[in-house]
Amino acid sequence: METQWTRMTANEAAEIIQHNDMVAFSGFTPAGSPKALPTAIARRANEQHEAKKPYQIRLLTGASISAAADDVLSDADAVSWRAPYQTSSGLRKKINQGAVSFVDLHLSEVAQMVNYGFFGDIDVAVIEASALAPDGQVWLTCGIGNAPTWLLRAKKVIIELNNYHDPRVAELADIVIPGAPPRRNSVSIFHAMDRVGTRYVQIDPKKIVAVVETNLPDAGNMLDKQNPMCQQIADNVVTFLLQEMAHGRIPPEFLPLQSGVGNINNAVMARLGENPEIPPFMMYSEVLQESVVHLLETGKISGASASSLTISADSLRKIYDNMDYFASRIVLRPQEISNNPEIIRRLGVIALNVGLEFDIYGHANSTHVAGVDLMNGIGGSGDFERNAYLSIFMAPSIAKEGKISTVVPMCSHVDHSEHSVKVIITEQGIADLRGLSPLQRARTIIDNCAHPMYRDYLHRYLENAPGGHIHHDLSHVFDLHRNLIATGSMLG
């Protein structure tokens, strides 16, 4: 069906990509990310550097790609600029050293910013596809991300045709691209499982300059075995949601959930699945991870909408082997739709995300360790946190065996403000911040979420801090962080 295009090896296709090109990769997490071109681009960079020639690309993605892909590009010094999110230890190190420029963005806004031309032209898009048609129809795989926008905006397109994927994966896709202001229509999604688009992206077939065949699974990893800390946080989340149902603030049929990625979120999903008082529910999220597949099988989750399937190869094979069951229960959308503020607000999504650090007034830091070193990025947490019906942030109360408190007087970096964070939950308890003044919020967070070994310090800070509506002692507000830098422990 796609024989009209030039077949190339990955190394041959990498020759198309020139120094300083803006390159856009498909995928959202490892799902749907290119498998062959990252290594080939790294190889080309090494060859050019050995020849004393400059070679670096500027790299746009949907969210993260596989850490291995970012690692190999980083090791080859092949990237000069990166956006909007990453999870690679090697790339993270270079970003924090200033060797790579990084732009941390709300994921729902990336496609729009590209369409507005804020980043310049996309020279080459590298897109994983499950199938092509001669008229330029491109069927994507397990991670939609920003691939539709990349396909439409790029000057040249390299397709990685991945034969690993079942052709029926296209049945999961719902591709719709919003118009441009001031004539942008509403997105007519009124139910988590509504479909409003097509199963493919239509582009000018002349833009496709190479097709590289692969047969490789996504690099999805099984998460670590649950620990007691994660399980206690999950229990507290379920307790809170049941209380909300009892008070009539969550309807009997429940509300759609958004859940981030990681061990805490996986534990929460497992506990929701086990609790008989939680009714079957839907998800309107950005990522579907391992636990969701099981809950779809059992019927606890009746339908799930997201931008990617970030799951193990075994779970993906289970879906492919049972597409008659799963095709009507999973929808994969572009991230400007999965993370769309209009839809999140309309559906009344309950957002469950993890933070690095919270201050006593309810601000949250989810990106920068000690305020300076990037961890991964804000990702989609801000899209959901700002617009959700209930915005819940979760974290352990301490890290590094108590040397670090997650609750501090003032966040060293703020990603989510006190005006949007509604609930904070640690293994210690639940801080419901709705309707509370700043000082009430502070006492609630300290009493319910801070670890006992830090509560006295935080209460003393609050009592001694001068102020009016908000109390802060700017001479001592970062003493915990200073102690950590000086001694390796916040308590010194």
Language-model segments: which ranges?
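Conserved alpha/beta enzyme-core scaffold
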Residues: 1-492
